[in-house]
């Protein structure tokens, strides 16, 4: 069923607190731009929400947090979906498109310290300090730069992770700046990690709005939320990831910046143990963002990324 002005536009969202905060922000923005329309949020649980005791890399990541939202749109039950862009696969199902990318929150990673480590930075933590992270990307980079630290998997929503930190299960956590700020935990950030030690995930800090490809009405509504600079940066990042066939199973990091119409993309592929790290940058016109991403991926493949990727896929790809 196509949305009409006579009924509410239905926005699909995961049920998690962060997802709802993000979706309700999109709902409010759409309402501001389109006062003659009504918007309602429809929540649902995704496969990724139900798997809390297994590292995501062990179960694959093709739509773990998006598939149910996408099926709902394809069935005509909802009209659009709001995703953390980093969770949205680079290949979308037939009939769906990435309609808009919103203005990005700081995409960097943050160090969140337990109380007894207050005043430290990542560089001053002593040997054996236990760092919680569920991301292979963060893990590989930090193992590379800080081999003396101890890393331990952590799952659960943001509140759960912070509670585990405060209970002493970890000495520190590595979390996304964006998620912490959106949920009102910005004061827990001990250090924003520099790009020199932690390139961020593709799309981190941005929201992606997905809808049906043929739904011209919804496409037009959603376009009003698009942020051109964020879009160019994220399209370059997603093209880079698509060429590498990566996801949360693979330690792939990026960093993008736009100055004077020129986009500089830095990309990284690391081995799981952090021993090998292939990293390089390219600069080009903003209008060629996706081409730039593809070119950088091919450049990294030539420098050894393909061998690293093959080893990782052989190790962590889930059984079909």
Curated annotation (Swiss-Prot):
Provide a GO CC annotation, any one.
cytoplasm
Gene3D superfamilies documented for this protein: Periplasmic binding protein-like II, Porphobilinogen deaminase, C-terminal domain
Tell me which Gene Ontology terms the entry assigns under biological process: chlorophyll biosynthetic process; protoporphyrinogen IX biosynthetic process
Source organism, top-level taxon? Bacteria
List the Pfam families.
Porphobil_deam (PF01379), Porphobil_deamC (PF03900)
Mind listing the GO molecular function terms for this protein? hydroxymethylbilane synthase activity
Residues with the S-(dipyrrolylmethanemethyl)cysteine modification: 248
Q: Which cofactor does it need?
A: dipyrromethane
Cysteines engaged in disulfide bonds, as pairs: none
Catalysed reactions listed for this entry: 4 porphobilinogen + H2O = hydroxymethylbilane + 4 NH4(+)
Enzyme class label: transferase
- Its Enzyme Commission number(s) read 2.5.1.61
Q: Per UniProt, which keywords does this protein have?
A: Chlorophyll biosynthesis, Porphyrin biosynthesis, Transferase
Q: Which CDD domains match?
A: PBP2_HuPBGD_like
Manner of cofactor binding, per the entry note: Binds 1 dipyrromethane group covalently.
Identify the metabolic or biological route this protein is part of: Porphyrin-containing compound metabolism; protoporphyrin-IX biosynthesis; coproporphyrinogen-III from 5-aminolevulinate: step 2/4; Porphyrin-containing compound metabolism; chlorophyll biosynthesis
Known InterPro entries for this protein? Answer: HemC (IPR000860), Porphobilin_deaminase_cofac_BS (IPR022419), Porphobilin_deaminase_N (IPR022417), Porphobilinogen_deaminase_C (IPR022418), Porphobilinogen_deaminase_C_sf (IPR036803)
The UniProt family comment states: Belongs to the HMBS family.
The protein's job, in short, is: Tetrapolymerization of the monopyrrole PBG into the hydroxymethylbilane pre-uroporphyrinogen in several discrete steps.
Subunit record text: Monomer.
| Additional remark text | The porphobilinogen subunits are added to the dipyrromethane group.
Give the protein's recorded name. Answer: Porphobilinogen deaminase
Provide the species name: Thermosynechococcus vestitus (strain NIES-2133 / IAM M-273 / BP-1)
């Amino acid at each position: 069923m196509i949305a009409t002005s006579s009924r509410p536009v239905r926005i699909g969202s995961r049920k998690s607190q962060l997802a709802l905060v993000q979706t309700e922000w999109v709902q409010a923005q759409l309402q501001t731009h389109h006062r003659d329309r009504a918007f309602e949020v429809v929540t649902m649980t995704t496969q990724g929400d139900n798997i809390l005791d297994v590292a995501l890399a062990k179960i694959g990541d093709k739509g773990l947090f998006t598939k149910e939202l996408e099926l709902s749109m394809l069935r005509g039950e909802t009209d659009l979906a709001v995703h953390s862009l980093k969770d949205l696969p680079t290949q979308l199902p037939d009939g769906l498109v990435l309609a808009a990318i919103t203005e990005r929150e700081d995409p960097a990673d943050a160090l969140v310290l337990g109380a007894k480590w207050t005043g430290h930075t990542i560089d001053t933590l002593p040997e054996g300090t236990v760092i919680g992270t569920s991301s292979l990307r963060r893990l590989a980079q930090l193992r590379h730069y800080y081999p003396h630290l101890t890393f331990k998997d952590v799952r659960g929503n943001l509140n759960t992770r912070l509670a585990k930190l405060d209970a002493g299960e970890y000495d520190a956590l590595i979390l996304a700046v964006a998620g912490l700020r959106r949920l009102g935990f910005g004061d827990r950030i001990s250090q924003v990690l520099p790009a020199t030690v932690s390139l961020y995930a593709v799309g981190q800090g941005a929201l992606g709005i997905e809808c049906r490809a043929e739904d011209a009405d919804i496409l037009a509504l959603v376009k009003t939320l698009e942020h051109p600079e964020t879009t160019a940066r994220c399209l370059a990042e997603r093209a880079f990831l698509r060429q590498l066939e990566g996801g949360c199973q693979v330690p792939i990091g990026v960093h993008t910046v736009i100055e004077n119409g020129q986009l500089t993309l830095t990309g990284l592929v690391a081995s799981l143990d952090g021993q090998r790290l292939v990293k390089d940058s390219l600069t080009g016109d903003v209008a060629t963002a996706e081409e730039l991403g593809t070119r950088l991926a091919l450049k990294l493949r030539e420098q050894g990324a393909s061998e690293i990727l093959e080893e990782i896929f052989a190790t962590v790809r889930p059984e079909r």
